[in-house]
Amino acid sequence: VLRGRQFFHRTRKASLEFALEMIRKAIEVDPEYAEARVGAAYTAALLRMYYSTLEGALEEADVESRRALELEPDSSDAHAARGFVLFLQGEMEAAEESFSRAMQLDPLQFESRYLLGRIRFQQGRHLEAANLFDEAGSAREDYQAAFFGAQAREALGSAEDAKAHYRAALEVAERHMDLNPDDPRAATMRAVSLCRLGRLEEGKEWAERALEIDPADAGVRYNVACLFALEQETERAIDCLEEAIAAGFGNRAWIRQDPDLASLKDNPRFEELVSGVGGAGC
């Protein structure tokens, strides 16, 4: 299960599917193994979040998160996993209750803070989101929490504070990629951080690297769209965003709050594209 959970912290479809397969085997050996149920819930939920057209993943996550809580009602990880599923189901109030319970049980529980930060960002509550991403990063170094903390500050209009956090996010992404050189999501967040810091050519290089690693990944396409939008390459940005949505990216609330896409907001093609997107994943 530990090995499987190492894979579900990555976002490539193949890695997530491999992780889920390993965890399912652990459940077959011991159906009462609560940690395995938590791992299955997280992994299936991540598959649904990043690949929204995938059938059956959210249903599996729902079943596994419920079973994990039945087995370990005082497990912070089980409550966080349940909150994750509720978040993807659009049950925001219930999700927040689950995350709050997870944080009460474990002051250093990462996922509850990170995912609640995602909810707050989508709601436009950027200061709360920034604080939650900071707390998540204090619980465990994570390039996504660091990057989204910088983004939340950008959305607040705190340019200098955002720049300092992009520098920190870049360092975290670099350390992560020293150990995981084939992580395309980290490569795209590294690329956008570089662009935000004025290092445009380096940013483009890392965006190209991400596309080489996994050209079909929805999250990679989305973040490359962000990079093009930052460079005022509007049509290329919208092309990439269109490809991301076709590949399964389906989070309208996130797209509308993302400061990296601000230059696209008045474009009719962008508005038409976003109006047809739904879901909770990003």
Language-model-detected regions and their locations in the chain:
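Alpha-helical adaptor scaffolds
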Residues: 46, 80-87, 118, 184-212, ...
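Acidic, Ser/Thr-rich low-complexity linear motifs
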Residues: 53, 178-183, 253-260
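Solenoid-like repeat scaffolds
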Residues: 104, 135-140, 174-179, 209-215, ...
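TPR/TPR-like (Sel1-like) alpha-helical repeat modules
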Residues: 166-170, 238-249, 278
